[in-house]
């Protein structure tokens, strides 16, 4: 899945007045101050962490067992402590593509948030080697959520609601710290067991304090909120807010329920699926319902309309899903028993396939 590129920079509180206009997402001085406090706390933590880095080669302390994941900027390994035998996950970032500051930032964000049960716990051990920076987290061994999503089908309803509830709680926790996650997608959700009972959010390299100025520099993806696709209200960009995460959560829930992306890009002029959704959202008429939405229940419609409101000030917060848990989110669950059995027996299949043409599949 293509990633989104962006530039971001801190924002001065004085730049937005209390109750700013909708183009600024309605950020108040109080909200921006919360973001600045989060930024200052992270700076202090980074300064301390820089002084306590362990300078050694990873192989001297840990033995590699197997790879757990690979990304554009680094890799994650399952390792064991050479003396104690403790299993750990080690994220390794090469120095040629990662600055010390970027490493310390991601490391410290993970440390500050990792007490939540739906966020991967980070341990306070940062390592500087000759060619890389590394830090340690709890190991989560059943892969990421994209491998569990069956294209054009999704997940069983109970699994969808469990995942959605846990991720919404994790995002609430992040927002309570004055931060915005900014990178919610199945690849950043780790699965703790074959039945997908528990999930954990990981990878905080894109997390930023609320109010940080953001400018999109690459093509949007389905999870990109539409306000980021519009011309920015200020030359520096758009001050980010938790509504960005609410939009991404809505897209993710749709993917889990259907096995489809609702659209490729949230741009009316280039994506007919997004245009169809906005027409239906505006009219509310059954005849305007886009085809991939046919099997969703009225409760799911209301939930997703709230999370996917194109206006950030009107968009419901991630906590809004609590009102819909326990209600049906699908009209019918075709092959539910078989799908649940497949989920338990083979969590590695699914999301690597891609539909060609028509509605984009997960």
From Swiss-Prot:
Coiled-coil regions listed in the entry: none
Ranges where the Protein kinase domain occurs: 62-330
Residues binding ATP, per UniProt: 68-76, 91
Keyword ATP-binding among UniProt keywords: yes
EC code: 2.7.11.1
Biased composition regions of type Basic and acidic residues, renumbered to the chain: 1-11, 330-348
Reaction(s) the record says it catalyses: L-seryl-[protein] + ATP = O-phospho-L-seryl-[protein] + ADP + H(+); L-threonyl-[protein] + ATP = O-phospho-L-threonyl-[protein] + ADP + H(+)
Pfam family, one: Pkinase
Active-site residues per Swiss-Prot or TrEMBL entry: 183
Source domain of life: Eukaryota
Positions of the UniProt region annotated as Disordered: 1-20, 317-362
InterPro entries according to UniProt: Kinase-like_dom_sf, Prot_kinase_dom, Protein_kinase_ATP_BS, Ser/Thr_kinase_AS
Gene Ontology molecular functions: ATP binding; MAP kinase kinase activity; protein serine kinase activity; protein serine/threonine kinase activity
UniProt key word Iron: no
Key words of the record: ATP-binding, Kinase, Nucleotide-binding, Repeat, Serine/threonine-protein kinase, Transferase
GO biological process, one term: MAPK cascade
PANTHER family (UniProt xref): PROTEIN KINASE DOMAIN-CONTAINING PROTEIN, SERINE/THREONINE-PROTEIN KINASE SBK1
Family note: Belongs to the protein kinase superfamily. Ser/Thr protein kinase family. STKL subfamily.
Name this polypeptide is given: Serine/threonine-protein kinase SBK2
Organism: Rattus norvegicus
